[in-house]
A protein has these predicted regions:
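Ordered alpha/beta subdomains of enzyme catalytic regions
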Residues: 1-216, 242, 316-406
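Glycine-rich phosphate/ribose-binding loops and adjacent secondary-structure elements
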Residues: 189-354
Length: 406
């Protein structure tokens, strides 16, 4: 059999044509067409199931790709803006839609699978990234997790991590998708290779300093051969004021008390007059470990698999109106809806679409509609903001949220 592609990835055209859908949607379309019912006008909404691990909120991501998916398809789409906080239910326990689609069901039924795939994974990554950033506060957090995932996904994963609030991403393609510069330090392989069979970390640190342009921070990896404390001292003595930071990437089998190790390194650097040298940590980090290591004195974090392989958000799409009549399967509520949010309290109220604007149930203040026109008759009518703008929006919302609770 002749190979038609190098990697097992669907093309843009295949996704747009619905060739990545589940077979039962293709059969549904076939049945509808055979019975002349493919023009039935429906409203279908997207809601989430309970959020992973008791998370109290999520960050909606993947909406720009959603726009590309539905562009040219004769439907109307209302959606929360990309980067919006969403909840499983509103303040009264009503499931919260993040978008709805209105049009002939035969026109978009085969797009349900890619629709959900585009937002389920990206929203999970963005949400985990936001939780990690919330735990780190103002300290630097970088996404280091693409090596654990299929390389075709690196732009999406790094974009979602950046939108979620992380300060930088490691991949070249991911940085391009995020509109940011790639960030990173140095691998153990560089230190081993530069040693040419000798234990000579200093040679690698100095070579990096000599070759890299001035704008690249000098962050020395300090756990290749010796104790992290010893190598940190060696690195500072080798590069002096040119050294921006040291990175501790200790294998899990040797971490022991990682916070205590951070405290030791910080002490040894400070007493030698190297208070300017930052401590970067990486390896198996999540929001709780970031919080603990931050308290111990870590200045920056490289977060990998916990973000790139974050739990997906369990979004589902359900028909809620059929030819103007309210319908719904068991466990769902019929009728088109609007989500009203108090920007001060971040409290939501879900009401039938067209209902009068409610007041915030907590503070009595004004609320704002979250589901806004996104696509009209197949044309994108909403602004598609740049990733840096979406990230700014996410960080603004995070100021009013906690990662605790359920």
């Amino acid at each position: 059999m002749k190979h038609t592609r190098l990697f097992h990835c669907a093309s843009d055209e295949e996704i747009k044509k619905g060739e990545t859908t589940d077979v039962y949607f293709a059969r549904t379309k076939q049945v509808l067409q055979a019975k002349n019912l493919d023009k039935l006008r429906v409203v279908a909404e997207v809601t989430s199931g309970k959020l992973p691990r008791g998370w109290p909120w999520g960050i909606l991501c993947g909406i720009e790709e959603e726009a590309r998916l539905f562009e040219g398809c004769p439907v109307d789409v209302y959606s929360m803006p990309e980067g919006s906080v969403f909840y499983y239910t509103d303040s009264q326990g009503v499931r919260e839609p993040v978008m709805f689609i209105e049009g002939s069901y035969g026109e978009f039924c085969v797009l349900e699978t890619p629709l959900l795939g585009l937002i389920c994974q990206a929203s999970g990554v963005a949400t985990r990234a936001a939780r990690v950033k919330k735990a780190a506060g103002e300290k630097l957090v970088m996404a280091f997790g693409i090596r654990r995932m299929h390389p075709a996904l690196s732009p999406m994963l790094d974009r979602a991590a950046y939108i979620g609030g992380l300060d930088g991403v490691s991949s070249l393609s991911g940085a391009k998708a995020a509109g940011a510069k790639p960030m990173g330090t140095m691998p153990h392989a560089l230190i081993i290779a530069l040693g040419q069979g000798q234990v000579d970390q200093v040679k690698a640190w100095k070579a990096f300093d000599e070759v890299m342009p001035p704008e690249v921070p000098r962050v020395a990896l300090v756990d290749t051969y010796f104790d992290e404390k010893i190598e940190s001292i060696m690195a500072t003595e080798a590069l002096k004021d040119r050294l921006y930071g040291v990175r501790l990437d200790t294998p899990g089998s040797r971490k022991g008390n990682f916070p205590e190790l951070v405290r030791e390194v910080r002490w040894e650097l400070d007493v030698r007059g190297y208070k300017h040298v930052k401590i970067f940590v990486s390896g198996g980090l999540d929001e709780e470990k970031v919080r603990v290591l931050s308290e111990a004195g870590a200045d920056a974090f490289g977060v990998g698999t916990s973000v790139s392989n974050a739990p997906t958000i369990d979004f589902a799409m359900d028909i809620i109106e059929l030819e103007g009549k309210l319908v719904a399967k068991r466990g769902k509520l019929g009728g088109k809806k609007q989500v009203w949010r108090c920007p001060k309290c971040m409290v939501d109220s879900v009401l039938p679409f067209g209902s009068p604007q409610p007041s915030c149930p907590e503070c009595g203040g004004k609320t704002q509609p979250m589901l806004k026109p996104f696509i009209k008759k197949g044309k994108i009518v909403a602004k598609l903001p740049k990733p840096v703008e979406i990230r700014r929006y996410v960080l603004k919302q995070l100021k009013r949220l906690s990662i605790e609770g359920s």
